[in-house]
Amino acid sequence: MAETQRPRSAIIVGAGAGGIAVAARLAKAGVDVTVLEKNDFTGGRCSLIHTKAGYRFDQGPSLLLLPGLFRETFEDLGTTLEQEDVELLQCFPNYNIWFSDGKRFSPTTDNATMKVEIEKWEGPDGFRRYLSWLAEGHQHYETSLRHVLHRNFKSILELADPRLVVTLLMALHPFESIWHRAGRYFKTDRMQRVFTFATMYMGMSPFDAPATYSLLQYSELAEGIWYPRGGFHKVLDALVKIGERMGVKYRLNTGVSQVLTDGGKNGKKPKATGVQLENGEVLNADLVVVNADLVYTYNNLLPKEIGGIKKYANKLNNRKASCSSISFYWSLSGMAKELETHNIFLAEEYKESFDAIFERQALPDDPSFYIHVPSRVDPSAAPPDRDAVIALVPVGHLLQNGQPELDWPTLVSKARAGVLATIQARTGLSLSPLITEEIVNTPYTWETKFNLSKGAILGLAHDFFNVLAFRPRTKAQGMDNAYFVGASTHPGTGVPIVLAGAKITAEQILEETFPKNTKVPWTTNEERNSERMRKEMDEKITEEGIIMRSNSSKPGRRGSDAFEGAMEVVNLLSQRAFPLLVALMGVLYFLLFVR
């Protein structure tokens, strides 16, 4: 394809959140897009389970966080959630969080309620400390949006910017665990638990996860937790329809066996030329975007004869993965009125429960778990006067290292008994007699149904050396016209994060494969960041603690001024000190991921 010629066609492998979103974006740019999906449904993990008796379950995600990223996706495509008949229902309270003695805490976006609840546990100055913690979460949130979720990291050289690196280190606290960081603000062990468990959204222990991820609970407490009427898949179904209006074609029940290339011509990198289906059919295209699990893709779909792919696949196999889950989907003959839409049951042995998952890849003896009752906020999820209940129990991922796998049937029975006993002990609800039908997803289910390596439901982990420029690239190693979108590539896991990644991937494709000076048909990340910086540079802390707090040591000086002052010092030092830092990071990256 000549450099001046735009790609006419694209194949997307996988109809998960990222594949659906990038398909619509490329179609808006004028590309003829075909999406291939091995299952008979779209949405990937973000799909629905329906029973003949009229119950509906969210198979995967059930909490809609970071609503701004969803709205941004729809607006970039020339529409809105409301225009596409997506109704978001806010959950009040956010959760009920149950402790082992039957006491509970119910976080909410209402600060007056939070003041009363927090001071019960933390004393008279507890709410002030909570506001300070919330302000820091806002800082993590805004910095991440601007410098991580709206920015591509095509190589380690992307970090060769002293202002960026110092911003990330100063503003995101990446080398301090969220558990330790929370201890700076909360005196009681229980409040530390309340404000750290959300790292499980990233498939990580709060004792290992960077403090950066307090942005998740900031989002919950500042923006709320939402649920789309009709199920989480309603959002992705709307994106499918938007894409179809622009010409995107979906082929379900269509498995892909390999990505094809031209083999490389005249000493150039091989280019992706299409795919071969499991039935042997060959489909040609100018470019290929893979939304399948990235570790699975490198091991099974990309040609191993291309230099570096086999070696990189082996490296990915040894990267730290997120957890898996045993998920129960229960149809009830009545209503579980003791349960809210979202319920968290925290283990008494909090740290030990995470160690069992992430260090021993096992089921904890006393697990923390999540209960979702979609029919509490959206009655259409179950027949009248009945409830649909989902119990998600985090567990270790499959080993796949030559060691014997755990006895998962026994662990499923143990998990079920533990969940039912804990619910009854803490709430008084005897759930077992109400269950009329059960569906179970185990780590093996996640692996086989969605091609998730090791059954890890959230892809690769999100520790420091698995994010930013250290996370797998959005473009395939050693190939042209082959790209990725999804949980294990940049910027990371979770539906809103993957939607942000779809924008990053689409913009990279337009930059690298379209003629120069081609106008991107939406507000680009660069343009959005510039606008955000203009609007937010002078924000100040408010009484509610929602605005970024000043870190200035000089009375009367705003945080943005102090930060700019720090940047001036950084600029003065960068000519001598920073090249050494970049060199050291490059050596470390080579030792960890290349050698």
Swiss-Prot record:
Enzyme Commission (EC) number: 1.3.99.-
Where does the UniProt entry say this protein principally localizes?
A: membrane
Q: Which reaction does it catalyse?
A: 15-cis-phytoene + A = all-trans-phytofluene + AH2; all-trans-phytofluene + A = all-trans-zeta-carotene + AH2; all-trans-zeta-carotene + A = all-trans-neurosporene + AH2; all-trans-neurosporene + A = all-trans-lycopene + AH2
What is the membrane topology here? Single-pass membrane protein
Q: Name one Pfam family in it.
A: Amino_oxidase
Q: Which residues form the signal peptide?
A: 1-23
Q: List the GO molecular function terms.
A: phytoene dehydrogenase activity
Compartments, record wording: Membrane
Induction of expression: The expression is subject to photoinduction.
Q: What class of enzyme is it?
A: oxidoreductase
Listed GO cellular component terms?
membrane
Which residues are listed as membrane-spanning? 574-594
Instruction: Report the cofactors.
Output: NAD(+)
| GO annotation terms (biological process) | carotenoid biosynthetic process
What keywords sit in the KW lines? Carotenoid biosynthesis, Membrane, NAD, Oxidoreductase, Signal, Transmembrane, Transmembrane helix
Pathway named in the protein's UniProt entry: Carotenoid biosynthesis; lycopene biosynthesis
Which InterPro entries does this one have?
A: Amino_oxidase, Carotenoid/retinoid_OxRdtase, FAD/NAD-bd_sf, Phytoene_DH_bac_CS
Role this protein plays? Phytoene desaturase involved in the carotenoid biosynthesis pathway. Converts phytoene into 3,4-didehydrolycopene via the intermediates phytofluene, zeta-carotene, neurosporene and lycopene, by introducing up to five double bonds into phytoene. Is also able to desaturate 1-hydroxyneurosporene into 1-hydroxylycopene and 1-hydroxylycopene into 1-hydroxy-3,4-didehydrolycopene. Gamma-carotene and 1,19-dihydroxylycopene are not accepted as substrates. Neurosporaxanthin is synthesized from geranyl-geranyl pyrophosphate (GGPP) through several enzymatic activities.
**What protein family does this chain belong to?**
Belongs to the carotenoid/retinoid oxidoreductase family.
Q: Provide the protein name.
A: Phytoene desaturase
Protein species of origin: Neurospora crassa (strain ATCC 24698 / 74-OR23-1A / CBS 708.71 / DSM 1257 / FGSC 987)
Gene that specifies this protein: al-1
